[in-house]
Every structure is written in C-alpha cells, then in structure tokens.
C-alpha cells in the first residue's frame, strides 16, 4: 500500500540515476487529488518532476495498462507481462542506459499469487524470473538502493493471514538472496 515511499526515497538521490520498477500496475495514473501523491500516481510524478531521473524502467504491467498511460516520455521504458512471458525483451535492452546507477523498487504484486499474496490484483511473474532480472541489473550496474512493498490484507482470518505471511517471508528471503 505504500509504494509511493519510493518517490520519497528517490527524491533524496542527487545524481543522475535510473529507476527500475517491478510492478503489476503502472503507478502512473492521473492524480485523484492534485498535490497528493498516492500509490496510483507516484511513478508518473518521479518521471515528470525528478531532475536526476534518466530513465524509469517499468517491468510487469499488462500491455493494455501500459498503453493506457497518459504520460509519454523518452525516459520511460516498459516491459509488459506479455513480453516477459514471451521472453521478448531483448529488442528494448539496448535502450537502457548502463552508465548511470539504479534504484530498484519491487512491488510483490508483480508476482504470481502462488508466490506472494498482496491486497491488490496480481501479475503472474515467477520468482525465478524476478531473480534472473535482478541478477542482470545488479551485475551490470551500481545499485543505489532497493525497496520492496506489497503485503497481504491484514483483515483476513488469522489462518489465511499466517499462510500468506509465510509466503511473503519466503519471497523476501529469496529476493534478498538474489540481491547478494
């Protein structure tokens, strides 16, 4: 629920950088209330307002959601869920600027429900795919920071909550190992 904290973190970066966002949603909707940053619009604000952002690389939304983004920018590179499943990402990799460090933000809703439970609609990315992509980034670029968000619904019955928390904990450990 607090993916917009990434904007707060990246606002502190005072050098050119790229932001890599793994998310089932674009987080680039028009703001519902002008001047208020939310989980639905924070990424659009980063690309428009942060003077140090070189690229925002968005990984995981459905193609139809990417097409609905109102913001057009040469700083935005997208990899749809469909491109990832088809392993058709190579055509865009030459657009990625490897000369600047990256900040990585992961919303666990990009992952399949069998791996992680969140309180939003979820994608179908496998943990191995996320680990592979993180490995490529971490091996090739300086990483300024990483954040992970996307928790399960705290209002669900306790047995389901405990099961989902266990899944999420396993996911965090796996992701942490990938970053090492």
Describe every region a protein language model picked out.
Residues 22, 104-108, 179:
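Active-site flanking residues adjacent to catalytic metal/cofactor-binding acidic residues
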Residues 18, 34-47, 113-153:
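A short alpha/beta connector and helix-capping loop motif
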Residues 165-169:
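C-terminal accessory extensions appended to soluble enzyme cores
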Residues 174-180:
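Conserved small/polar residues in nucleotide/adenosyl-binding loops
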Residues 57-65, 144-159:
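Acidic carboxylate-rich catalytic motifs and surrounding loops in phosphoryl-/glycosyl-chemistry enzymes
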Residues 2-15, 88-100, 131-139:
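Short amphipathic alpha-helices and their capping/turn segments at secondary-structure boundaries
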């Amino acid at each position: 629920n607090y993916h917009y904290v990434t904007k707060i973190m990246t606002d502190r970066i005072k050098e050119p950088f790229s932001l890599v966002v793994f998310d089932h949603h674009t987080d680039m909707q028009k703001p519902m209330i002008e001047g208020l940053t939310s989980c639905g619009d924070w990424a659009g604000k980063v690309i428009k307002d942060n003077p140090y952002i070189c690229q925002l690389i968005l990984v995981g939304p459905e193609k139809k959601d990417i097409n609905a983004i109102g913001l057009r920018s040469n700083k935005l590179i997208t990899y749809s869920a469909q491109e990832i499943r088809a392993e058709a990402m190579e055509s865009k990799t030459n657009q990625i600027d490897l000369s600047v460090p990256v900040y990585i933000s992961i919303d666990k809703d990009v992952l399949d429900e069998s791996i992680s439970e969140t309180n939003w609609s979820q994608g179908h990315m496998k943990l191995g795919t996320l680990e592979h992509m993180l490995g490529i980034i971490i091996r090739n670029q300086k990483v300024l920071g990483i954040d992970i968000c996307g928790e399960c619904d705290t209002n669900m019955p306790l047995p389901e909550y405990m099961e989902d928390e266990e899944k999420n904990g396993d996911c965090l450990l796996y992701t942490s190992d990938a970053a090492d």
